[in-house]
Amino acid sequence: MIIKLEPINDNNIDAVLSLSVREDQPFVAPNDVSLRQADEANAEDPGTARPFAIYADDHLVGFCMFAFAPKARDPEDRYWLWRFMIDKSEQDKGYGQAALAEIIRYFRENGADRLYLSTEPENERGLHVYHKAGFRETGTISEDEAVLMRMLKGPNKTIKEFYGINVNERLRIKRKKGYGVSIAVFDGEDLDTYCAGSGRFGRDFPVNPDMLFQAGSVSKPMFALTLLRYVDKGLIDLDADISGVVPEFIKKGPVTFAALLSHTAGFNLHGFPGYRADHEPLSLEDVLNGKGNTPKLRRIRPYGKQHMYSGGGYTLAELTFTRLTGVTLREAFQKEVAETLGLKRTGFFQPLDEELASNAAFGGRLAEKEDPAHGYHYYPEHAAAGLWTTPKELVKIGRALSKSYREGGLLRKETARRMMTPVMDSYGLGIQNLRGDIGYHDGWNEGFLTTWMFSLREDLCVAVMFNRSTDELDWKQSYIAIDLFQTAEEDLAEKPGKGRLKALCGKYEHPDDAEICVDEVFMQDGKLYAKFLGDDGEFTSQLYPIGKKTFGRKGGFSKLTFGKDCVTYNDLSCKKL
């Protein structure tokens, strides 16, 4: 059998358009759709799409289409088998496997070091063919399709990379029965997910994009969002004194929702450890009166004078909210947020519903230590720590908040802007505002870690959830989220030319009152760097573009804005020498 790939031309296009797959193979797009997409791609970037007819011994048997972008920065964007089909009358004759071998040879001869494709996870027949050809799942789900990759040079080892990041290596995910991670990224165009490891330590329970994780303190912005929906309806006043609603816990007012949400009311109880899943239910009053495993709520700092993170303050706010509205937070969130955004797997499920528990992650080794059937804790403090969700749905919420901030939507624009405006220490109403244009919150429940961040300038959001909680892994998974966010942010930005970058290079003055300042900007290996001087010494960071005159600092939440012969960093302007 001789397989030949022939470019689509006037002589074969009609025959290719007549090809089709079986009715039980709905995974493959019709060839006319594929060719139309090829025309659109090539109109924008000539040569990107390469459609071919597949011949076996000079007999037309199928169609394929490649995507070539060898100059793309991310290796995953360079070489793709975009479409592949064998006509229904020619299947089960070995043509598919033989054609894949010829396709692999074509890519290898044209300089590709690896080849990607994607297909629906339910496409068992296609996956069997791809696996036989050496393709393996990368762990990424893009637009509901599983991404597979085959190395074309060197050993055919699957590289578990997501946006160029080796997530498994950085989080030490080495076994399919070890700990697991779930990630979602919306990069302005597509929703991509990545899953690896097990949702339940020691068990064959692969993480999937719809698996529920506990979100820890990311519960707080979800409570704030719910409450602000009531503010927009005129049912709650953020600045009204609420001490009369909960007089047993506030002996002296005033206390407002705004102060509680911004952690400036001065209350204790930083966080909550949770209880075994089979623990008897506790009321919010029980928690605040110290009848659980945490001390009684009390004020330990002057009201409104400093930022002091307080899960106890959020629990007090939740109790006040339920007394004012007559509904539980679970009910209010479901109606105001989940139903509005079409969320199916996000809510204050305490305890977790049995129908949801079948696809829920366990936290750390709680199943081994406490309850084999329920490897997670019960959190009666819903607003502070009680949310269950998925990264995909966290991204949907982040995008809705970003849109609200930019133009209004789920919240009125002015309400969203107040939510994101720092009161003290970068913390607004339930959420941090980092760098002036990033909404951020992380979470830590027993056995669970979460990092969630979204842009206030554009449609970009990242969520990372992990079923293990240690100090080391906390910062590691946070930096994975930061790296993913900054990679997507850089991809969305206008790319400055080398001439423009070189014009920014040089030494900058050191203002006398500066705790930290830019000392020098320079080029290295075609990339822009800045050296900073501060009270703790000097350090160097790579810069990346986020706007026409603005650059972010890799690995950190700060930005540099260049003007005429000056640079502004942390609101401090340094003149170029």
Could you tell me what each predicted segment is?
Residues H131-T140:
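Conserved acetyl-CoA-binding loop of GNAT-fold acetyltransferases
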Residues F107-S118:
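Conserved GNAT acetyl-CoA-binding A-motif
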Residues P155-G197, V327, E331-K335, E339, ...:
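Catalytic loop of the DD-peptidase/beta-lactamase superfamily, centered on the K-T-G motif
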Residues L117-L127, E143-E145:
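Conserved beta-strand-loop-alpha-helix junction that forms the acyl-donor binding cleft
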Residues D92-R105, H128-K132:
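Conserved acetyl-CoA-binding loop-helix of GNAT-fold acetyltransferases
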Residues I2-S89, L100-E102, Y106, G139-E143, ...:
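Acetyl-CoA-dependent GNAT
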Residues R200, G253-E446, T450-T451:
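Short, surface-exposed loop or secondary-structure junction motifs
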Residues R175-S182, G202-L260, R299-G312, H382-A385, ...:
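Short active-site loop at a secondary-structure junction
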